[in-house]
């Protein structure tokens, strides 16, 4: 089986969705978003007052969130830790937030390092997905370097192969265990059809020992990709990467075959539970069918 230090395998117990959902009837900050509806959702000047940014595909708000008390504050000195909240974009159904939440649960089940995550169902028309910031620990800033920045790669267009991702990970971290983590991330993206895997969605964090390690996963969700392809190809294959491509990648980057086979088997075994999880999270049935059909096609290529 794969080395447990680099691949934890399926979690002993997946978090129950209802435990991680939060109600916001008494929340002043998110309640104001709900009261104003979509008009505020797309008002970037209003979001900026809460620390938001118009950058990226979806509007964001930076808040202080305390999971224990469920208190949310727009003040930097508020209780809890800094959490970016991502809301659906114009014309999107709030289920996009539920899908990203479900993917965060599945990523953790598959052994990927994930920051704490929450789904915030604000009202029937409005939702948010939030994660704890990976560049803050105990109030201190953690140096983070994106792969796009390290390689001067244009994240706006497909420009990388996972061979480059793994080799860059080896060069930056000097740790083959981190390379194995990057391989696991590749397998997850292939199986779960996360094709928005561009160069800016891989990063490295500096440890207290002044060493670089692969950052926790982020921006994981179902995505069909540009023209149906992965932004980052797998040994040259972006449209339909399969078992042979993943094993060739492992061999090229000195990932032990036993570890690679274990990763593929474990992640594939975690695909089916996504269906019920999407339903619990409130994803529409037709969307569930679309997502699971894509995953089944991916599983057939990896069998």
Region annotations inferred by a language model:
Residues 26, 68, 90, 134-136, ...:
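Short, glycine-/Ser/Thr-/acidic-enriched flexible segments
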Residues 128-133, 216, 272-278:
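A short beta-strand motif that forms the metal-chelation/ATP-contact edge
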Residues 27, 91-110, 157-226:
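Conserved kinase catalytic-core segment
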Residues 47-155, 205:
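Conserved ATP-binding subdomain of kinase catalytic cores across diverse folds
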Residues 238-302:
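Mobile late-domain/C-terminal helix-loop "cap" segments
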Residues 1-52:
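P-loop NTPase switch module centered on the Walker A-proximal segment
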Residues 121-127, 187, 201-207, 266-268:
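A glycine-rich phosphate-binding loop feature that marks nucleotide/adenosyl-phosphate handling sites
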Residues 146, 152-165, 206-260:
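Catalytic-core segments of enzymes that bind and process phosphorylated/nucleotide-bearing substrates
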């Amino acid at each position: 089986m794969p080395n447990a230090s680099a691949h934890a395998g399926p979690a002993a117990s997946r978090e129950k969705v209802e435990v991680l959902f939060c109600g916001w009837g008494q929340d002043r900050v998110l309640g104001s978003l709900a009261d104003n509806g979509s008009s505020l959702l797309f008002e970037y000047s209003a979001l900026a007052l809460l620390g938001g940014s118009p950058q990226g595909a979806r509007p964001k708000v930076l808040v202080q969130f305390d999971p224990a008390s469920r208190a949310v504050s727009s003040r930097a000195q508020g209780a809890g830790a800094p959490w970016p909240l991502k809301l659906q974009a114009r014309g999107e159904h709030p289920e996009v937030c539920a899908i990203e939440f479900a993917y965060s649960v599945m990523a953790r089940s598959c052994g990927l390092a994930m920051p704490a995550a929450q789904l915030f169902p604000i009202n029937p028309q409005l939702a948010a997905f939030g994660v704890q910031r990976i560049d803050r620990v105990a109030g201190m800033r953690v140096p983070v370097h994106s792969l796009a920045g390290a390689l001067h790669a244009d994240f706006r267009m497909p420009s990388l192969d996972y061979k480059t991702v793994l080799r860059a990970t080896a060069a930056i971290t000097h740790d083959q265990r981190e390379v194995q983590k990057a391989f696991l991330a590749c397998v997850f993206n292939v199986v779960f059809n996360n094709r928005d895997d561009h160069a800016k969605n891989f990063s490295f964090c500096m440890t207290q020992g002044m060493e670089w390690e692969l950052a926790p996963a982020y921006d994981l969700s179902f995505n069909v990709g540009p023209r149906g392809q992965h932004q980052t190809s797998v040994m040259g294959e972006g449209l339909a990467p399969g078992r042979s491509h993943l094993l060739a990648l492992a061999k090229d980057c000195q990932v032990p075959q036993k570890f690679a086979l274990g990763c593929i088997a474990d992640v594939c075994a975690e695909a089916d539970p996504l269906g019920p999880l999407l339903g619990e999270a409130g994803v529409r049935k037709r969307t569930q069918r679309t997502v699971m059909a894509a995953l089944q096609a991916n599983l057939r290529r990896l069998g």
